């Protein structure tokens, strides 16, 4: 009697997550090595992002042209391009994902601007300001390289030391809130004193 029970295939782990968390050390190290070498070469020769993209486009179009020409010369058959069509489901899913991302960004901006506390707002503005300064000092491929290096280091550090980081951040948040409350109370006291002093001067003048 044949066994009808089939085992479910084991789910495949996410390759990107494995690289960021260094579960596949060889692949993560290879990614870091290739990106570092590419960044050094680009910085050494002074290439810009537009130049690199243009050269990649030239190479891709040239290879496709040679491939199509060889197919026509050898087999006299036109290249099969039906597999290059973009399905409607893919387009709909891509549009839905982009819309959800934009809606989430808009909601996040309104939460930070209208609903969050002052230190969240200040931290967000400071982050955007630092990002703008980095953008003025660095070119595009350097920013991409820094982002990749941070992506390969920050998640791993957060996985190992996330609890300690959250503990210190919570302590810093409480201290900042206490300092803000103290400063706010002192400012209110000074305003009240100035207001009472002004009223007394007005009464004396009358």
Curated annotation (Swiss-Prot):
Annotated PANTHER family: RETICULON, RETICULON-LIKE PROTEIN B13
Membrane topology (UniProt): Multi-pass membrane protein
Protein's organism: Arabidopsis thaliana
Protein name, as recorded: Reticulon-like protein B13
Primary localisation category: endoplasmic reticulum
InterPro entries in UniProt: Reticulon, Reticulon-like
GO biological process: endoplasmic reticulum tubular network organization; response to bacterium
Coiled coil, from the record: none
Intracellular or extracellular location(s): Endoplasmic reticulum membrane
Bilayer-spanning residue ranges: 27-47, 50-70, 134-154
Cystine residue pairs: none
